[in-house]
Amino acid sequence: FSQRRTAASHEGTSILTMLTSFQEEQEGADIHVTAPSVPRPEDLTSALEIFRTIDHPVARFLGRTAAFDLRHVEGNLYLRPSKERSDVQHLWMRSRSRIPEQTSQTVHRALLAYVCDQVMLEPVLRSQGLSWRSEGMSLATLDHAQWFHRNVDIGDWLLYVQDSPSSRGGRGMARAQVFDSSGGLVSTIAQEGMVRMPTDSGVDAGSGRWRIRMGEGDDGSAIPG
């Protein structure tokens, strides 16, 4: 076993403190929880298809350049809240680009750590009846912990099984279990984030993530009005 502590700063201001732990591969019991039965990604709508229908510069940019394909089981939160509040979310994700076979596990795991931040707080939004375009919302990651249990293939479909056990005082807690396409548990993640709305006491309005006027009856896949 070994550990390494990393500190990052920008223009003299500390922006990150990270502690990483390592272990050499060794023999031992191989047990994990079972992945839930959910619709396969081939039967779900890609976020790329949704972005390409939205007349918004950020959406158009993501529709062309997003490095990962995301497919929500319960429906996405890009344009409107979920019809029913829930603290649970399932989604599939994989890289859009082919990953060379010789790519090391260091790269695969780094990419998973990078991309999971895009969706980790979505169960918090879902439980509060919010979406990425909720007017005035302010959101930021505060703390993040991640464990890698098995090898990761970021070029294959990964299933995120997420929940949010608590929200209070402008902070929300989220957890995720990440399974590979064969059902193996490859990673466990926990993250706390700031999720604030202008109705919260003493909170200034944020920018939200989308400023789009939607037509009545729009299901999130049609062009906004």
Q: PLM ranges: what are they?
A:
Residues 1-225:
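Terminal targeting signals and extreme-terminal segments of soluble enzymes
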